[in-house]
Structure formats: structure tokens, C-alpha cells
């Protein structure tokens, strides 16, 4: 599940990962037409990966909630909180959380404090998480430093430990570009490996 403010690339990342998994070219025209999520959206990506000497065929199901906060007001009534109240009973397991922010908008990074509180109850003790920065292709506009990213990762880890003292999942940070495709193959592999590892920790 990718979470974060609106317009940080949650839907875009999942759409492009599907193309990467099928070795298709990134379609910039399609990307330009992606609109914000107003409900819980679903994307599926299947990838084949080798870990050690074992071949895995992993299907990833992405649940993409809105990035609108209830406190900010939403005329459609489809804030993150409202959508989660509807769908939370049907969400049985989250193997990976993508805390997503825009490298060029530092406020989206700082707002991850809000999102970790929002998904804490959805996690289990084996849920992995990735601190995911988007818009890596716009490096000249980056507002989030490497030191801030490292500090943010540690902050999220501590917050999750406070929420779930028996948490055994792994965490990392990664920065990607949906325009150039940079690091998306790495992200796809990490997601697949995280699902496998999460299921090994807690079948």
C-alpha cells in the first residue's frame, strides 16, 4: 500500500511498475493523464524474481488510498480516513507499506509523520516498509537532503516500533523516477522480496 499526500506519484509508480515488469516502454502520455485517487484504487503487477537459487513468481496487489486528509476538508467526502473506515475490515494483510513523498516538495516529506499514524493499525508485525522518494529526474529541484532521508527512515522505524513493539519487518529508502525509469527495477525486486520475507516471518 502506497501512502502519502496527494499528487506525489502513488498511482503513477504502481502503473509504471507494471510496464517495467512486462518490459514495456514508459508511456509519458498515459502518465500525464493520471488523476488523483478519490477512492481505494487497485493495481496488480506480476514479476518473476530469483532469490538465491529459487525462482519466484510474485503477484503484487497494490491498494492505493486517497492522499487527501480529513482534517483538510474534502467536498467529495473521500478522504483517506473515510475510505479506510469503509475498506479496513476487508484488508486482511499488508506485506509492504510505501511511505511516498515528492523529492521536490519538502512538505510532502514532513507530512509522513501524519501517514505513519494513519497506517499503523493496518500493519502487522511482519510488514516491511519503504521510504519512497519520487521525481528523482528533477534533481535540480530536490528539497529533501540525504541526511533528512536517513533521519526520516529512522523516525518511521521508531514510530512503527512504538505502535507495534514486536515488529520484525525490514525497512529501507529508495528514490525513483517514473519518467526515466531510474531505480524502478530495484523497487520491483525489493517489493517482491519483501512480500516473500514477510510471509516467511509470519505465514
Protein language model regions, located:
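TRAFAC-class small GTPase G-domain
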Residues: 1-202
Amino acid at each position: 500500500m502506497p501512502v502519502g499526500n496527494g499528487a506525489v506519484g502513488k498511482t503513477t509508480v504502481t502503473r509504471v511498475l507494471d510496464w517495467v515488469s512486462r518490459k514495456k516502454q514508459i508511456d509519458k502520455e498515459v502518465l500525464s493523464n493520471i488523476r488523483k485517487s478519490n477512492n481505494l484504487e487497485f493495481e496488480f503487477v506480476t514479476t518473476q524474481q530469483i532469490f538465491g537459487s529459487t525462482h519466484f513468481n510474485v503477484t503484487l496487489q497494490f491498494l492505493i488510498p486517497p492522499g487527501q486528509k480529513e482534517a483538510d476538508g474534502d467536498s467529495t467526502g473521500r478522504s483517506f480516513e473515510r475510505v479506510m473506515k469503509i475498506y479496513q475490515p476487508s484488508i486482511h494483510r499488508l506485506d509492504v507499506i510505501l511511505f511516498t513523498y515528492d523529492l521536490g516538495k519538502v512538505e510532502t516529506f514532513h507530512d509522513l509523520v501524519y501517514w505513519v499514524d494513519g497506517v499503523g493499525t493496518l500493519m502487522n508485525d511482519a510488514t516491511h516498509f519503504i521510504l519512497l522518494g519520487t521525481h528523482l529526474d528533477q534533481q535540480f529541484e530536490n528539497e529533501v537532503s540525504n541526511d533528512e532521508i536517513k533521519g526520516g527512515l529512522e523516525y518511521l522505524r521508531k514510530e512503527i516500533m512504538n505502535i507495534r513493539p514486536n515488529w520484525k519487518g525490514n525497512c529501507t529508502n529508495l528514490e525513483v523516477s517514473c519518467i526515466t525509469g531510474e531505480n524502478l527495477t530495484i523497487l520491483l525486486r525489493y517489493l517482491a522480496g519483501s512480500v516473500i520475507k514477510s510471509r516467511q516471518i509470519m505465514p
